[in-house]
Amino acid sequence: GLAPYLLLSSSQAQSTANSFEKISDIALSQISALKNPNGHLGVFRIPKQGKLNFKDWVVVLDGLQDPGNLGTIIRLCDWFGIKQILCSPDTVDVYNPKAVQASMGSLSRISVYYESIIPHIQGLNIPIYGTFMEGTPIQKIAFKTPGIIILGNEGNGISAALSEFVTEKIAISSHPASQAESLNVANAAAVVFYE
């Protein structure tokens, strides 16, 4: 995760950062990349990444493009105790302001790696679950730890190259009367992580 270096706030706040400064709302809005900053802005040192390991759950993100989805998935991982995310190199940047904002601080507690996925997962002897429209209904899956959960691109799903490594295709059943085409990838992640 990340370690706080400086916290700027338009209100009094407790901080574990080395430095804390109270600033005006106007000053905060001038330095923030967001139209409506929430009153706090943090500056973090990016620590050297530890080595990715597969001793517990790892979430793999295959080509996600929406920074809000990435930030939400980081927050979900934090909520459900998943500490590592492996992103394909074409996944949106984790430090995109919208991704950072959507993570709501969870980015400081989750390790996010950007590397080629296949070299990491080929030859692993653990379950690799992938989200598909035509998979086994999630409520029928007996998830085993450690394991990998692959979530695909918003428009195209999991790439054909990664699909070959999936040992269990999983799906989230819709209500019979539903006319929705699919779930947003972050919404799907919430359902899968809960199971």
PLM feature spans:
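Short, polar loop motifs at secondary-structure junctions
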Residues: L8-Q14, P47, S116-I117, M133-G135, ...
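RNA substrate-binding interface of SAM-dependent RNA methyltransferases
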Residues: G1-L2, K51-G135
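Arg/Lys-rich RNA-binding interfaces used to dock onto structured RNA substrates
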Residues: G1-D66
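Active-site regions of enzymes building and remodeling cell-envelope glycoconjugates
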Residues: A17-I26, D56, I126-I128, K144-I148, ...
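Active-site/ligand-binding-proximal alpha/beta "capping" segment
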Residues: Y129-A180
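Short, acidic/turn-prone active-site loops that include or flank metal/cofactor-
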Residues: Q12, D25-L28, D90-V92, I117, ...
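Structured adenosyl-cofactor binding patch, chiefly the S-adenosyl-L-methionine
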Residues: L76-F80, T91-S108, A160-E195
